UniProtKB/Swiss-Prot annotation:
Keyword Ribonucleoprotein annotated: yes
Name listed for the protein in its UniProt record: Small ribosomal subunit protein uS9
Species: Burkholderia cenocepacia (strain HI2424)
A GO CC term assigned to this protein in UniProt: cytosolic small ribosomal subunit
Keywords: Ribonucleoprotein, Ribosomal protein
Length: 130
């Protein structure tokens, strides 16, 4: 705990989010912007708010987030993971409910690298029989 802030780091794909939460009125600031201005997709906003809604803390915390790397979906997943870890730092009794919802586990899926001799990671050149 840093002062009266609770901290959590979240990661998803190549995105990393540093999340700070403290008691407040429910403001979420991402990279200096309100969350609705930062994330344009409604699904991204929903993903970020999932752990707060699950624990009924939607309007009880002010959240500051620094996130970099990746795209919008990866950043939203990283912020969700960071908020989850910060909530656990705030109150460890929330961990079972967050864990059963699958928010504590880091999504380890990464982009598969392109292989030599193939067009993409798995896509080969079109095969011609004749």
């Amino acid at each position: 705990m840093i002062g009266n802030w609770n901290y959590g780091t979240g990661r998803r794909k190549s995105a990393v989010a540093r999340v700070f939460i403290k008691a407040g009125k429910g403001d979420i600031i991402v990279n200096g912007k309100p969350i609705a201005d930062y994330f344009s997709r409604e699904t991204s906003l929903m993903i970020v708010r999932q752990p707060l809604e699950l624990t009924n803390h939607g309007q009880t915390f002010d959240i500051k987030v620094n996130v970099n790397g990746g795209g919008e979906t990866g950043q939203a997943g990283a912020v969700r993971h960071g908020i989850t870890r910060a909530l656990i730092d705030y109150d460890a009794t929330l961990k079972p409910s967050l864990s059963s919802a699958g928010f504590v586990t880091r999504d380890a899926r990464e982009v598969e690298r392109k292989k030599v001799g193939l067009r993409k990671a798995r896509r080969a050149k079109q095969f011609s029989k004749r």
